[in-house]
């Protein structure tokens, strides 16, 4: 495809247009008086959101070079969302201001590389000051942080606080849709571990990039799976039952993984696979814990068990399993509660008998995972649109609260950034030329979140910032008053602010030091098929054999079915089989 090139100030100006296009749409979503953004969906009702990352991802700009700028600032929002779970709008606002100020100075003759250095020096100073101002989160502050992150919604703050209190920081909190109008909290058995799906093709929710399995059957083994030949009988039973299926194994690779993906994508089997957590003996112990939680039998060669011996009775089950790219959460049924309790007691006895402090710590980690349980926040609403909106708000609030527990909190409403901005003045005055200008770019950007919070609440941002400096108090956008925000419970998680600053400086500096932008030249739309007087639909090509389920079953090589080598059967349209080597 032919490319178009843009150079120097021309490229930077086009990139800035893209940045402004996205940032102006995103920044209305910050603060307690934030506004909503309505997003059209091709199918179903439109989404109403107040989340910077979601808004940024939806925006495409016709000009290819400007669209590159839009994608860069989208990267800021998505990276902050991924790392902190919140703070995407703050990061976007900071980036926009740094880009605007930086480009003004470059147009006046400043060196982009020196500006970048100055911005990095300023960032290091800001992060040091931010850390020094951070305070640990006390139990009573959890609800305050959750409420602020939920846009001042007291109900959401209360539910998250209760959930945190019950399952503690070692437990798991998940958010799901409720069939009722009320938002409720339910505590059940479950756990999570740090392993994600083996392939992104297992994802069931493309927007959130998660795989969700409702009432799945679960195979747990400490063996490596590279072929599905031994599992064909059990896979056939699973397919007939219509149950989702999770394979948790030491590893699943090669032909086995490819075959599962193809069968998943062709609708033959709702399946996913996850590598077992940890390593060595600790891995086996973790698999035993998960087996007890789910009522499964651990298929292990140590117990003289092989995969071809697996029956439906050896499989575990769960209410729901949610898998992201790096984490798996299991919500278990209550009927394993006594088994889990007995397992925890056994592990506690092991701790008492173990002299190694390291081993004691690791066993205690297992106890915490098993005993912590899972808190289910069931989101109720009158309409599907409201349901999606509330669910997003709760997820953001939950992420912010977890971040606050990790690294503490600072005064909210942008007050801490304003204080640090004033302290940057001394550093700036000690620097020279473009380095000083780079520091000042960061200094000015630190004021922007508060200005936008004030603007969204109907106040003049410049006036509000001036009053904050004069009174040495923060601005409560809910009441329109200047207060001690820590006493008022208006707190921001330090981690969220830190990551927003780091990500915004990183992307802004990259954009300011860009000299050439390269993008595809859009191709003209193709003429309608069929030609004058012809069928506008064209003709339908012949279809290959569909290989529908039941044609030969899921048997061994030579038989129709799951798509093993040499097999015909349940292939995708136009294919005799699943597309594996040697398939008919």
Swiss-Prot record:
GO molecular function: ATP binding; ATP-dependent protein folding chaperone; isomerase activity; unfolded protein binding
Subcellular location: Cytoplasm
Any single Gene Ontology cellular-component annotation: cytoplasm
Annotated binding of ATP, by residue: 29-32, 86-90, 413, 492
Primary enzyme class: isomerase
Annotated catalysed reactions: ATP + H2O + a folded polypeptide = ADP + phosphate + an unfolded polypeptide
Pfam families named among the record's database cross-references: Cpn60_TCP1
This enzyme's EC code(s): 5.6.1.7
Keywords from the UniProt entry: ATP-binding, Chaperone, Cytoplasm, Isomerase, Nucleotide-binding
SUPFAM superfamilies membership: GroEL apical domain-like, GroEL equatorial domain-like, GroEL-intermediate domain like
Biased segments, Gly residues type: 530-542
Chief site of localization: cytoplasm
GO annotation, biological process: protein refolding
InterPro entries: Chaperonin_Cpn60_CS (IPR018370), Cpn60/GroEL (IPR001844), Cpn60/GroEL/TCP-1 (IPR002423), GroEL-like_apical_dom_sf (IPR027409), GROEL-like_equatorial_sf (IPR027413), TCP-1-like_intermed_sf (IPR027410)
Region Disordered, annotated ranges: 523-542
NCBIfam families, per database record: GroEL, PRK00013.1, PRK12849.1, PRK12850.1, PRK12851.1
Function: Together with its co-chaperonin GroES, plays an essential role in assisting protein folding. The GroEL-GroES system forms a nano-cage that allows encapsulation of the non-native substrate proteins and provides a physical environment optimized to promote and accelerate protein folding.
Quaternary structure, from the entry: Forms a cylinder of 14 subunits composed of two heptameric rings stacked back-to-back. Interacts with the co-chaperonin GroES.
Homology family: Belongs to the chaperonin (HSP60) family.
Protein name stated in the entry: Chaperonin GroEL 1
Organism: Prochlorococcus marinus (strain MIT 9312)
């Amino acid at each position: 495809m032919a490319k178009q090139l843009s150079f120097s100030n021309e490229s930077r100006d086009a990139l800035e247009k893209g940045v402004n296009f996205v940032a102006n749409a995103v920044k209305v979503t910050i603060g307690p008086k934030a506004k909503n953004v309505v997003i059209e969906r091709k199918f179903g009702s439109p989404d109403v959101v107040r989340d910077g990352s979601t808004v940024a991802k939806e925006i495409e700009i016709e000009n290819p070079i400007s669209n590159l700028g839009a994608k860069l600032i989208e990267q800021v929002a998505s990276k902050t969302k991924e790392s902190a779970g919140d703070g995407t709008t703050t990061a976007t606002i900071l980036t926009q201001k740094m880009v605007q100020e930086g480009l003004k100075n470059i147009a006046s003759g400043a060196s982009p590389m020196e500006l970048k250095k100055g911005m990095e020096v300023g960032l290091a100073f800001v992060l040091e000051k931010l850390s020094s101002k951070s305070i640990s989160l006390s139990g009573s502050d959890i609800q305050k942080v959750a409420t602020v992150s939920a846009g001042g919604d007291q109900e959401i703050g209360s539910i998250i606080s209760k959930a945190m209190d019950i399952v503690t920081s070692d437990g798991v909190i998940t958010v799901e849709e409720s069939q009722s109008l009320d938002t409720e909290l339910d505590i059940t058995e479950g756990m999570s571990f740090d392993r994600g799906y083996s392939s992104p093709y297992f994802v069931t929710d493309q927007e959130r990039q998660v795989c969700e399995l409702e009432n799945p059957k679960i195979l747990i083994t400490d063996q490596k799976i590279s072929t599905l030949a031994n599992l064909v009988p059990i896979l056939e039973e699973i397919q007939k039952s219509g149950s989702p299926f999770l394979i948790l194994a030491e590893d699943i690779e090669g032909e086995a993984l490819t075959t599962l993906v193809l069968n998943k994508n062709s609708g033959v089997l709702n399946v996913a696979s996850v590598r077992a957590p940890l390593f060595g003996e600790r891995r086996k112990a973790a698999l035993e814990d998960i087996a007890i939680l789910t009522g499964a039998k651990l298929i292990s060669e140590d117990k003289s068990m092989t995969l071809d011996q697996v029956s439906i009775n050896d499989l575990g089950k769960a209410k729901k399993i949610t898998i992201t790219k790096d984490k798996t959460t299991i919500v278990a049924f209550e009927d394993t509660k006594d088994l889990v309790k007995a397992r925890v007691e056994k592990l506690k006895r092991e701790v008492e008998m173990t002299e190694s402090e390291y081993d004691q710590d690791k066993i205690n980690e297992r106890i915490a995972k098993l005993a912590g349980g899972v808190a289910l926040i069931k989101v109720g609403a009158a309409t599907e649109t409201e349901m999606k909106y509330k669910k997003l708000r709760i997820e953001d609030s939950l992420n912010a609260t977890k971040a606050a527990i990790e690294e503490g909190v600072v005064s909210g409403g942008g007050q801490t950034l304003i204080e640090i901005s004033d302290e940057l003045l001394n550093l700036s005055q000690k620097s020279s030329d473009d380095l000083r200008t780079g520091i000042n770019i960061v200094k000015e950007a630190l004021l922007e979140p508060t200005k936008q919070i004030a603007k969204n609440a109907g106040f003049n941002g410049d006036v509000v910032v001036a009053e904050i400096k004069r009174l040495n108090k923060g601005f409560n956008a809910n009441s329109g008053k200047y207060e001690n925000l820590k006493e008022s419970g208006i707190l921001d998680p330090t981690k969220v602010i830190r990551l927003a600053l780091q990500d915004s400086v990183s992307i802004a500096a990259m954009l300011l030091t860009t000299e050439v932008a390269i993008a595809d030249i859009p191709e003209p739309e193709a003429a309608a098929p069929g030609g004058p007087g012809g069928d506008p639909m064209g003709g339908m090509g012949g279809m290959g054999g569909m290989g529908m389920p039941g044609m030969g079953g899921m048997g061994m090589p030579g038989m129709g079915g799951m798509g093993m080598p040499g097999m015909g059967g349940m292939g995708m349209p136009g294919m005799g089989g699943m597309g594996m080597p040697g398939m008919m």
